[in-house]
Regions:
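PP2C/PPM-type serine/threonine phosphatase catalytic domain
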Residues: 1-171
């Protein structure tokens, strides 16, 4: 297992396991230290292609945030890159911009899975689904971190030997 250094105060590592009850692993995770992203998606069991939904959601999230990071841009709701202020490292990584980027990226990931369901003609009771949870850390400011989650995957913090649950299940 590889350990990734995200910033001066954050390290991350990850693994998935099929567990004892399922025959197929429907989890996907990503650690991208360049853009400060740590994310996990857990495909919804009992529906079609949860493993595809989790993989595609993670990829869509990473692509969106990497594009924003590389261009120094925040996408608007109509997907056109737009600059909200002059391009500076500290300005682009402000908490306000992290919130905007993260919300837009999660919506983009959801739209990707929704579109795939529509393209496959899957009815709502069988459509692909996934949870999505993670953190994005501003590379220039270790105190600017945004957590996001949809579904019942949980986010925990380990600090001083104590584990604390940071999210409530969204089902």
């Amino acid at each position: 297992m590889k350990i990734f250094k995200i910033d001066a105060n954050t390290i991350a590592t990850g693994t998935t396991d099929v567990g004892l009850r399922r025959s197929q692993n429907e989890d996907a995770f990503l650690i991208d230290s360049k853009i400060g992203l740590i994310a996990l998606a857990d495909g919804v069991g009992g529906r079609d292609a949860g493993e595809v939904a989790s993989f595609e959601a993670i990829n869509a999230l990473q692509e969106y945030l990497a594009e924003c990071h590389d261009k120094g841009a925040i996408r608007s709701k109509d997907n056109n890159p737009t600059l909200r202020q002059p391009v500076t490292a500290s300005g682009l990584n402000s908490t306000s911009h992290l919130l905007d980027q993260t919300l837009a990226a999660v919506i983009h990931a959801n739209d990707k899975v929704y579109t795939m369901n529509q393209d496959r003609g899957l009815p709502p009771d069988r459509s692909m689904g996934t949870t999505l949870i993670g953190l994005i850390c501003a590379p220039d400011d270790p105190w600017s971190t945004v957590a996001f989650h949809v579904g019942d995957s949980r986010l925990y913090r380990l600090r001083d030997g104590q584990i604390e649950q940071l999210t409530r299940d969204d089902t």
